[in-house]
Amino acid sequence: MENNHHLAKDSLDELNPKRGKGEHETQVSQYTVVEEATIPQSLVKTSRSADHKVMEASKVADTRTAWSTKIPAVLLPVFVINIALFKYLVFANFSTKDRVLFGLGNGGINIFSMWLLLATYETWFRSIKEVIVACGAGIRSFPQKRGVNMLYAILKLTFVNAFAIPLLMFFRSHFEQWRLGCPLVERVIGVMLNVAYFIIEIENPGLFTRVFNKYCDCLFAIRDILNRN
């Protein structure tokens, strides 16, 4: 029996000269180990995470569809307010300091008016205090609860444009020789700032959100002051 076993091993080695003697035994043991291996836990966790993301995406899609009928009615008055204030800011005879303050106020008015309209449109609050409380609480939880990320992006873009307005006014105030070409320069700067905003959001998504939340804290402060009164 032993002679037959050695002859079988020698015949295998002769069929494949590159294989060292006895190497087939090692490969057989390796295959045995592979068969006994279990699925890595990391793959299981990844699969569960993917399933969870699919479920969340479907919920967001359903919510976005439900809100699609409300978006035009809510945004139209906000854009009208924005255009009116912007035109007044451009053509009014303000100093640079006044323009900066008014520009920041313009962004604040847009943010607050959007939330005022959203809150009033949805639940018809009975008092201004309740509207401010709802707006302040909703700003931080809006993307998670509503799922309408487009509105949240527009909200933050309004905040970015509030800083863009004073910069545009700087060109109109200090470069009189550019007055004829100033509208084009203003549009280019506005587009560049909005593109820069999206780049920042992609590269460092938490940076602008932290700044935006600081701005939202002002609304919470207003809410607290009104609640004391």
Swiss-Prot record:
Transmembrane parts of this sequence: 71-91, 100-120, 151-171, 188-208
Location in the cell: Endoplasmic reticulum membrane
Major site of localization recorded for this protein: endoplasmic reticulum
Basic and acidic residues: bias regions: 1-26
Region ranges (Disordered): 1-27
Record keywords: Endoplasmic reticulum, Membrane, Transmembrane, Transmembrane helix
One GO cellular component, as annotated: perinuclear endoplasmic reticulum membrane
Source organism superkingdom: Eukaryota
Membrane topology (UniProt): Multi-pass membrane protein
Family named by the database record: Belongs to the WTF family.
Protein's name according to its UniProt entry: Wtf element wtf14
Originating organism: Schizosaccharomyces kambucha
Record lineage: Eukaryota, Fungi, Dikarya, Ascomycota, Taphrinomycotina
Name of the gene: wtf14
